[in-house]
A protein has these predicted regions:
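Positively charged n-region of N-terminal signal peptides that target proteins for export
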Residues: 1-7, 99
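N-terminal, polar/Ser/Thr-rich
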Residues: 16-49
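Asparagine-centered strand-capping/turn motif at beta-strand->loop junctions
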Residues: 56-60
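Solvent-exposed beta-hairpin/edge-strand motifs
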Residues: 68-113
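Extended, low-hydrophobicity, Ser/Thr/Pro/Gly-biased non-transmembrane segments
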Residues: 91-101, 106, 118, 142-240
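Hydrophobic helix-coil surface modules that form long, contiguous segments used
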Residues: 191-329
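Zinc-dependent metallopeptidase catalytic helix centered on the HExxH motif
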Residues: 315-387
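Amphipathic alpha-helical substructures
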Residues: 371, 416-487
Length: 487
């Protein structure tokens, strides 16, 4: 997710303003999971009713007696222990007043038969299907009936100003690692999501005239007053949608990739479409070919700068012109770092956020016609980080580590400076240490070797060590553990 990282941060921090940021393991399961979701959107009540079919093949070397699903929309209900936004952001998230939503599961079956299931987890945000005997390699067919109450909020999951965002909206399988299912709740800082890749076929029936953006190849079927939009995607880490009867869509070709830009009102739509297409082409050259046939960029009411999903990104309609351009580029970089190459976003957010943020600098370096002084950009980022750590040292207790869980950052400001800003500085430092040729060779190897998988920090470090012939573990550790000196 993109939180605006601005050169003006230095000035803002100096004024004492709060930062404008948002607040190899068992995860490498073979691609054996598939989802089929048939959903109906009722725009009069802002509810979604859905039937979800999941085929899961046990890829682990252990018998499973249960399966866990995350129910992320549960965080938006009244009384949730983990609210989706920080207290200081509530008025910005809910301009019309706090409006609750959520998810209700009404039925679960296994193999077409009734089964044992319950709602659990630390915040009643997990679906547990129990009483199973699933040996390694065994297949499990599950069906889940659920209803969404979409809240009026400027967020990943919510609606505002005629646009509906459905991000992290359906029951999604948790990751099984270290002998247990991951049950991380919906933290308000960062992107508290972690999932393996799967194949998706998702249809959304909505009133005719509503335009739907989503993950994957798109097809539509009109039946009088309703239109069903169907998306298919293979080997993706998540699936998201956005819908509105006010969307305009423009398209461009980026080396064989169809780039779409959806917006309600944007006088510079063609410019932003071009930035998106240029980003796809630039990162394909730097890292390796874009992994999917299409990409949709959606300008939407959103509390933060942007949010990444496979083949679909949200960018906030409240950003300034320069920030909107940066958000588009940053979120598209996530198609390489998060969508294709996964990592644990809850414990190692610096891996994808740091690379995505540094990719913005690389984009401007490779596209000088955009008029951004890259040298000054890096210097300003360094200065803003040093100033932040000096001014907030009492609050953060001197902890400048980057390997904290999302819940261990004292605020989204702390999180952003240590995953985005310091993360970008880390990769700039690696580049200067190993040289351009080996730096980009390592990233290409990383992308090639870990697309469709979940990479651990040591996997990333090994790519740089192998390409450079240098021992870099201690170098990375000093940055990640917070012992490196930055001045």
């Amino acid at each position: 997710m993109k939180k605006p990282v601005l050169f003006v941060l230095i000035i803002m921090l100096a004024l004492g303003a709060l930062c404008v940021f948002a607040g190899g393991c068992d995860g490498n399961a073979a691609k054996t999971t598939s989802y089929k979701i048939d959903a109906v959107l009722d725009t009069s009540t802002m509810t979604v009713t859905a039937e979800e079919s999941v085929t899961f093949v046990n890829p682990y070397e252990t018998e499973l007696d249960c399966v866990y699903f995350h129910l992320y929309p549960a965080a938006f209900r009244e009384g949730a222990r983990y609210a989706p936004v920080e207290d200081r952001k509530i008025s910005e998230a809910y301009p019309q007043g706090v409006d609750y939503g959520g998810i209700a599961v009404s039925n679960v079956t296994v193999g077409g038969e009734a089964c044992a299931w319950e709602i659990g987890g630390e915040d009643e945000d997990m679906l547990l299907v129990t009483g199973l005997t699933l040996m390694p390699g065994d297949a499990l067919d599950m069906a889940i009936s659920f209803t969404l109450d979409v809240p009026q909020i400027r967020h990943r999951f919510g609606y505002y100003d005629g646009i509906i965002n459905l991000g992290n909206w359906y029951p999604v399988l948790s990751v099984y690692e270290d002998g247990a299912w991951r049950t991380d709740p919906y933290y308000s800082s960062g992107d508290p999501f972690y999932s393996d890749t799967a194949d998706y076929t998702v249809s959304l029936k909505a009133p005719t005239g509503w335009n739907v953006a989503g993950t994957g190849k798109i097809s539509t079927s009109v039946d009088g007053e309703t239109t069903t939009t169907t998306f298919t995607a293979e080997g993706v880490r998540d699936f998201a949608l956005s819908a509105s009867d006010k969307f305009t869509c423009v398209e461009a070709d980026a080396g064989g990739v169809t780039v779409r830009y959806y917006y309600k009102a944007d006088a510079n739509a063609e410019k932003h479409l071009k930035a998106g297409a240029d980003a796809v082409k630039t990162f394909s050259e730097l890292y390796g070919a874009y992994a999917y046939p299409s990409l949709s960029v959606v300008l939407t009411p959103f509390l933060y700068g942007g949010m990444e999903y496979p083949q679909l990104v949200y960018v906030s309609d409240s950003l300034s012109e320069s920030l909107l351009e940066e958000a588009i580029i940053h979120e598209i970089a996530h198609q390489w770092w998060y969508a294709a190459v996964g990592n644990d976003q809850i414990t190692d957010a610096w891996m994808d956020e740091g690379l995505a943020e540094y990719s913005v600098t690389l984009f401007y370096e490779k596209n000088p016609d955009y008029g951004v002084d890259v040298t000054n950009r890096i210097a300003d980022v360094m200065q803003s980080y040093v100033l932040f750590t000096e001014m907030y040292s009492e609050l953060i207790g001197g902890d400048t580590s980057m390997n904290r869980k999302l819940c261990d950052y004292f605020s989204s400001t702390d999180y952003s400076f240590h995953t985005y800003v310091k993360g970008a500085l880390l990769f700039d430092s690696v580049r200067h240490s190993v040289g351009d040729a080996k730096f980009f060779a390592a990233l290409k190897t990383y992308y090639k070797n870990y697309t469709g998988k979940v990479a651990a920090p040591d996997d990333l470090i090994a790519c740089f060590e192998n390409e450079s012939g240098m021992k870099l573990k201690a170098f990375f550790d000093s940055w990640v553990n917070g012992t490196v000196g930055l001045y």
